[in-house]
């Protein structure tokens, strides 16, 4: 018998303000048709004035706890994946911990940009397998609208705000691929490519938050090359292949990347959970939100084999394979 980290609850939160492409047409030199054609995005959500990443994260976390029929006091740890924290420190995770009324365990943030949730899930899995924790809240939360340069029309139209969360619980398994829970993970980084996707501000450099800068064509090239490969590697680690996959839940960067990656994996789009049209690119929040939406839609069901994959600034990229 072996231990597995099993998803027992999911939840997400979207700010109430919906920003359709037509609204962005009034802010920058763009069109609804251009945005849809290039990205597949139709609308996104922006946090309200005064609404911060920790607010979004807390709401998503509470939804996941409710789904798992747990309270905050049942949880041993909180891990938040974010690149847009409320403050330089303390961690958003500690703010979430306090707001949930959790007075035990530990909390910390993970920063791997759009790949952050995959890294956080792998981290939480290791914590559970090592006996450090039995129940962990893993959250992806972002307010990317706060780091948009509204004169950069090719980039500012792509991003949105939101948060998603899962509850991971230790459960007994057989060690086989039929077990529920995380079966494998593959994580990668290559800092040589850090200049194609970054924020031009920071505490020890400019003492400003800065704005997101992206070389879209280069990011697209790396995404197509690396996402299918990391998913294939993670599947192989579990002794599985693409033919075993029920659902791919990718980072919702844009529809062209999602479609090209699925094609490269040999998986039809009818087996891919897609939320990018409604959410835009929400960085580390995109996969947990897509998991939550996939469950709510009735797509992801118990026993399904799910593959998540993401790439973000760093560059950092990875995949987690799990049985729902």
From Swiss-Prot:
Keyword Protease recorded: no
Listed A to Z, the keywords are: Acyltransferase, Cytoplasm, Fatty acid biosynthesis, Fatty acid metabolism, Lipid biosynthesis, Lipid metabolism, Multifunctional enzyme, Transferase
Identify the CDD domains for this entry: KAS_III
Q: Which sites are catalytic? A: 114, 251, 281
**Stored Gene3D superfamilies:** 3.40.47.10
Q: Which GO terms describe its molecular function?
A: 3-oxoacyl-[acyl-carrier-protein] synthase activity; beta-ketoacyl-acyl-carrier-protein synthase III activity
The annotated region (ACP-binding) lies at: 252-256
- EC number, UniProt record: 2.3.1.180
Q: Which reaction does it catalyse?
A: malonyl-[ACP] + acetyl-CoA + H(+) = 3-oxobutanoyl-[ACP] + CO2 + CoA
One GO BP annotation is:
secondary metabolite biosynthetic process
Q: Name one Pfam family in it.
A: ACP_syn_III_C
**What are the subcellular locations of this protein?**
Cytoplasm
**Signal sequence extent:** none
Q: Which domain of life is it from?
A: Bacteria
Q: Which family does it belong to?
A: Belongs to the thiolase-like superfamily. FabH family.
Q: How does it assemble?
A: Homodimer.
Q: What is known of its domains?
A: The last Arg residue of the ACP-binding site is essential for the weak association between ACP/AcpP and FabH.
What role does this protein play?
Catalyzes the condensation reaction of fatty acid synthesis by the addition to an acyl acceptor of two carbons from malonyl-ACP. Catalyzes the first condensation reaction which initiates fatty acid synthesis and may therefore play a role in governing the total rate of fatty acid production. Possesses both acetoacetyl-ACP synthase and acetyl transacylase activities. Its substrate specificity determines the biosynthesis of branched-chain and/or straight-chain of fatty acids.
Protein name per its UniProtKB record: Beta-ketoacyl-[acyl-carrier-protein] synthase III
Q: Which organism is it from?
A: Dinoroseobacter shibae (strain DSM 16493 / NCIMB 14021 / DFL 12)
């Amino acid at each position: 018998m072996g231990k597995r980290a099993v998803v027992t609850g999911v939840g997400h939160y979207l700010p109430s303000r919906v920003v359709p492409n037509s609204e962005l047409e009034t802010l920058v030199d763009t069109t609804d048709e251009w945005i849809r054609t290039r990205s597949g995005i139709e609308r996104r959500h922006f946090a309200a004035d005064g609404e911060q990443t920790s607010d979004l994260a807390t709401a998503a976390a509470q939804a996941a706890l409710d789904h798992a029929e747990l309270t905050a006091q049942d949880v041993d740890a909180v891990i938040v994946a974010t690149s847009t924290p409320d403050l330089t420190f303390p961690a958003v995770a500690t703010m979430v911990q306090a707001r949930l009324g959790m007075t035990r365990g530990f909390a910390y943030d993970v920063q791997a940009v759009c790949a952050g949730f995959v890294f956080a899930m792998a981290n939480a899995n290791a914590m559970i397998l090592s006996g450090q924790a039995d129940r962990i809240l893993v959250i992806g939360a972002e307010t990317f609208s706060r780091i948009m340069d509204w004169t950069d029309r090719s980039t500012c139209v792509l991003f949105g705000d939101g948060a998603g969360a899962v509850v991971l619980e230790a459960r007994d398994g057989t060690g086989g691929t039929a077990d529920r829970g995380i079966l494998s993970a593959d994580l990668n980084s290559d800092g040589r490519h850090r200049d194609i996707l970054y924020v031009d501000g920071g505490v020890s450099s400019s003492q400003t938050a800065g704005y997101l800068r992206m070389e879209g064509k280069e990011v697209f090239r790396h995404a197509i090359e690396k996402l299918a490969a990391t998913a294939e590697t993670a599947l192989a680690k579990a002794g599985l292949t693409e033919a075993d996959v029920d659902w791919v839940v990718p980072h919702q960067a844009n529809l062209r990347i999602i479609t090209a990656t699925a094609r490269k994996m040999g998986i039809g789009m009818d087996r891919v959970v897609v939320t990018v049209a409604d959410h835009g690119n929400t960085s580390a929040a995109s996969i947990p939100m897509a998991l939550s939406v996939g469950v709510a839609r009735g797509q992801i069901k118990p026993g399904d084999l799910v593959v998540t994959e993401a790439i973000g600034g760093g560059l950092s990229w990875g995949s987690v394979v799990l049985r729902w």
